[in-house]
Curated annotation (Swiss-Prot):
UniProt lineage: Bacteria, Pseudomonadati, Thermodesulfobacteriota, Syntrophobacteria, Syntrophobacterales
Residues annotated as binding sn-glycerol 3-phosphate: 109, 140, 142, 195, 248, 258-260
One GO term (biological process): carbohydrate metabolic process
Name this protein carries in UniProt: Glycerol-3-phosphate dehydrogenase [NAD(P)+]
Annotated active site: 195
Amino acid sequence: MKPGGPIGVVGAGSWGTTLAQVIADKGFEVDLWVFEPELCKTIRETRQNDLYLPGVVLSGRINAHNDLDRVVKNHDLLIMVVPSHVYRNVATAMIPFLKPDAVVVNATKGIENDTLLTMSGIWREVLPPGLQVRVLCLSGPSFAREVARKVPTAVTLAGDELQTAKAVQHVISTGYFRIYTSLDKIGVEIAGASKNVIALAAGVSDGMSFGYNSRAALITRGLAEITRLGVKMGSNPLTFLGLAGIGDLLLTCTGDLSRNRTVGIQLGQGRRIKDILAEMRMVAEGVKTAKSIHFLARRIGVEMPICEQVYRVIYEDKDPRVVVRELMERDLKHELELGH
């Protein structure tokens, strides 16, 4: 794939801005959609996104726009990075401007609350029959601030057919941002969304000063839960041993830059979720995803005890100390049975 013009990036949060910078470093012109008019003006005038990626000087190849059509119309390749709770609205607004054969790379990690659809599932629902838009998914262990500093990073790009995935892989990969391809789109999306819920649990554990043993147990058993869910939905179990699975899970559960882990730490210290979120500018996707995972697991009959308890802490104000006791006193199991 050789895009005939600029590449569009829809969303100028920390990750969207960083991906725009990566693509600009590859030599492409980038049209970046910025929702906030004042931020758009700031990026144009100062070459910095002081709201979401402060301290990073942006490439002169990045052109900030407040009009969505300027970023979508006549673009062969689009990267979409908006919060999951507004994803459907933005995708729907893009449709009148999409090229019939455009490629959209989803870089949002989440599951829609009302429909329990992944982001590519939303595209399947909103795209009219006449458009042959190909939707891929980019996920993996990638803190935006580290990628913006050109720290070596590896991620997974999943699509429905290998030719398109490889084409996009060659367009976006750089000397510091390495992309591997996959054909397991649902597995990559489920892993990317679910790991944020486990990161909340790991943060609660850290906030309660439980130590490394507890964190290791949560990550390992959390991976088992994510794998059960993914396999039940048709994923390849090996996906969860890769970058989009255990790689992203490890990073989000242990890294100090993890917003979800940070929220979990404060929950573990006894703070209320509404007070924590009131102080945050950026989105911790795990908070909304905990609700989606709770209902999705119940609907398809998958046991996810850690995710279930995270849901109860956030949405039912359950005491984390009670959660720990209940998790540790569950019926004893054989470790490697997929149903447990």
